[in-house]
A protein has these predicted regions:
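Hydrophobic h-region of N-terminal signal peptides that target proteins for export
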Residues: 1-5
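Structured catalytic-domain cores with a bias toward divalent-metal coordination
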Residues: 6-172
Length: 172
């Protein structure tokens, strides 16, 4: 199959020349990737931050590194450290598992949306069920203009799916 790295899409993902990059992080990902075709500009140009931690700071290496499987506490601590270091991350406790382990969700957005999450949720609920707005198209358009779509990405549903939590740490 053709490599994404060699595709025309690659040019659309150029790094911001003003953004400091984490060269070590990109090198580690390249080292652990089984085929260079899987690496793209996105994995070669990872932004660096003096305040927001990377998964490597939580685990000692990049997500997906050989022989590295993060424990639940490490994963939760990482997401909470993101929330503590960035106004664009908020962590919620959403209950406990059958075995009594805490389950969390992380919302990642701009500060304004995080401050307005509940109102945004209510607007989206109205759009999801047009009966709530009396099937009023003009009200629907107003809600669309005021609302921000939410993308829900989940992982770690099954204990044998060990890569998902690491992937979510990386994605965050």
């Amino acid at each position: 199959f053709p490599s994404f790295a060699a595709s025309p899409l690659e040019t659309h993902f150029a790094a911001d020349p003003n953004q400091k990059m984490d060269a070590w992080y990109g090198e580690q990902i390249a080292k652990y990737t089984t085929d260079p075709a899987f690496n793209t500009q996105l994995t070669r140009s990872l932004p660096a931050s003096d305040t927001v931690p990377t998964p490597a700071k939580a685990m000692g290496d990049v997500s997906g590194a050989p022989n590295m499987l993060p424990r639940l506490k490490t994963i939760h601590d990482y997401f909470r450290s993101l929330a503590a270091s960035s106004p664009r991350v908020k962590v919620f406790s959403i209950g406990t598992s059958e075995e009594g382990r805490e389950m969390i969700a992380a919302a990642i957005a701009d500060e304004a949306l995080l401050a307005d999450l509940e109102n945004n949720r209510q607007r989206l609920a109205q759009l999801a069920d047009p009966r709530l707005i009396g099937l009023d198209d003009s009200r629907a358009q107003e809600l669309i203009t005021q609302s921000v779509p939410v993308y829900y990405i989940t992982g770690a549903i099954h204990s044998t799916e060990t890569g998902n939590p690491s992937s979510l740490m990386e994605l965050a």
